[in-house]
Amino acid sequence: MEIIDNVLSEKTFNNIVNYTCNNNDFPWNLVQNGVSVAGDGKYQFVHEFRSETGVMSPYNYLLRNLYLRLGVNTLWRCKMNLKIKTKKTHVFYPFHQDFTSLQVPFTTVVFYLNTNNGYTLFEDGTKVDSVANRMVMFNGNTKHTSASHTEGDRFRFVLNINFS
């Protein structure tokens, strides 16, 4: 596992944030189940830059410099999650691997687009705080989960990338 701060230049990072997080016209889809248990009330909004079926978003070009920085050879999936601030206590989703059927080694990156008190938690107890322009890179088979944020901005933005 590797944690890297200031992943992108300020200009490149702000360009991504302005076109996605700060853009009222950026398209989001409501996902009510995801890795949660159906009916548990947990949900998030998602924009898929590259879906598991290979469909590419017209906004995928925004991430070109990030893909180059990561050394992406094959992009399996890339999605941005928008999570809404919760009251008083963190909400956790179940521990999961992003792909259980992928038969090749792959890397997962969680890239944080804003700073808040949400975080990524790993099954071994490691906690990585949501800090803007920070990423955590790890083996794709590593189980992890997210903790909602309870302070700061109304929304938490996280980019999730799976590649080899």
Region annotations inferred by a language model:
Residues H90, V128-T145:
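Conserved metal-binding segment of the jelly-roll/cupin
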Residues L82-I84, L113, F163:
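Short beta-strand segments enriched in hydrophobic/aromatic residues
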Residues M1-T74:
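Non-heme Fe(II)/2-oxoglutarate
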Residues V109-F111, G152-S164:
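A short hydrophobic beta-strand segment most commonly corresponding to one strand
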Residues K88-F95, V104-F106, Y112-V131:
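A short beta-strand-loop-beta hairpin characteristic of the jelly-roll/cupin
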Residues L68-T89:
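A short glycine-rich, His/Asp/Glu-containing loop-to-beta-strand
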Residues P94-H96, K143-E151:
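Short beta-strand His + acidic residue motifs that chelate non-heme Fe in jelly-roll/DSBH
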